[in-house]
């Protein structure tokens, strides 16, 4: 899993912090244009820049990211020495998938405030998405030295290790995340992914069952469990579990989607076989049919 409700992927830790910094309790959307200033008054410019940043944070809270980006970009011009404003801009780029564009503002934010772990965690996210895993690991480990008890960052670090096939380090990082938050099912799920790639099918099954026990509404551990059970010869439970999983979210019937969620080669090979089973193919066919529109 990559980006789960908490980020199999990523938990964008910087954006919530930016929102809290600028305050979003009473959202009011003023005009975006910066008032004309006859004389450059530094205090006035700073006030305007922070106001724009606050508006940007408010818009981001309502997922209006493109509008938020415009304001954040203007804010960095008016208050170029404010690390929170740069962090906000970088986090917004991440939210809209402009991962390369996020690097420069996050680096600027980090140069202005080297003690804020959320900036480093966001940098780790950006580097991971760009497949720059060494840089991702460096940023995440530096952030964790400042805030070692952040399960989302430990999870992201585990993902980066996993992509480098540093399986022991990946499991250790996931386990630390679970020690801090024992119901953090994405980390438990990903321990299963690693164990499966190492050939420990029984261990993977145990992890996926544990993840399901925490949150039975999640598709990924259920489908992974179904695939593993099928490989072990437990056909009926495999089919029942797999059908139930796909009914929760049929995107998991797409191998490309599974690759995005960090499923490894061994599990993908078994999943390809599983998805070709007649009952599973029929289930997916039904789920992918257009739903009839209610009569007016």
Ranges and model annotations:
Residues 209, 213, 219, 223-254, ...:
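TPR/TPR-like (Sel1-like) alpha-helical repeat modules
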Residues 42, 49, 83-84, 117-118, ...:
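Helix-start (N-cap) detector for alpha-helical repeat units in TPR-like alpha-solenoids
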Residues 61-62, 95-96, 129-130, 146, ...:
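Register position in tetratricopeptide repeats
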Residues 31-43, 244-296:
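Terminal, low-structured helical/coil segments at or just beyond the last alpha-helical repeat
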Residues 78, 112-113, 146, 180-181, ...:
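Structural marker of alpha-solenoid helical repeat scaffolds
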Residues 45-84, 88-98, 125, 129, ...:
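Alpha-helical segment of the N-proximal tetratricopeptide repeat
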């Amino acid at each position: 899993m990559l980006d789960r409700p908490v980020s199999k992927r990523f938990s964008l830790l910087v954006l919530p912090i930016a929102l809290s910094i600028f305050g979003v309790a009473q959202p009011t959307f003023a005009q975006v244009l910066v008032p004309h200033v006859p004389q450059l008054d530094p205090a006035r410019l700073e006030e305007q820049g922070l106001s724009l940043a606050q508006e940007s944070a408010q818009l981001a809270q309502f997922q209006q990211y493109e509008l938020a980006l415009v304001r954040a970009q203007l804010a960095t011009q008016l208050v170029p020495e404010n690390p929170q404003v740069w962090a906000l801009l970088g986090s917004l780029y991440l939210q809209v998938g402009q991962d390369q564009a996020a690097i420069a503002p996050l680096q600027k934010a980090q140069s202005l405030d080297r003690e804020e772990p959320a900036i480093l965690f966001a940098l780790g996210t950006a580097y991971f998405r760009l497949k720059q895993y060494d840089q991702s690991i460096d940023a995440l480990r530096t952030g964790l030295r400042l805030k070692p008890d952040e399960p989302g960052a430990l999870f992201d670090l585990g993902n980066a290790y996993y992509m480098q096939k540093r399986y022991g380090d990946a499991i250790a990082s996931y386990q630390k995340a679970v020690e801090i938050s024992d119901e953090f099912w994405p980390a438990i799920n990903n321990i299963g992914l690693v164990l499966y790639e190492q050939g420990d099918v029984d261990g993977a099954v145990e992890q996926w069952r544990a993840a399901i026990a925490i949150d039975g509404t999640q598709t990924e551990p259920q489908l992974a469990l179904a695939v593993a059970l099928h490989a072990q010869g437990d056909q009926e439970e495999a089919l029942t579990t797999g059908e139930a999983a796909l009914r929760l979210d049929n995107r998991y019937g797409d191998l490309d989607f599974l690759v995005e969620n960090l499923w490894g080669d061994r599990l993908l090979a078994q999943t390809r076989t599983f998805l070709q089973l007649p009952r599973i193919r029929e289930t997916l066919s039904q789920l992918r049919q257009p739903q009839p529109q209610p009569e007016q």
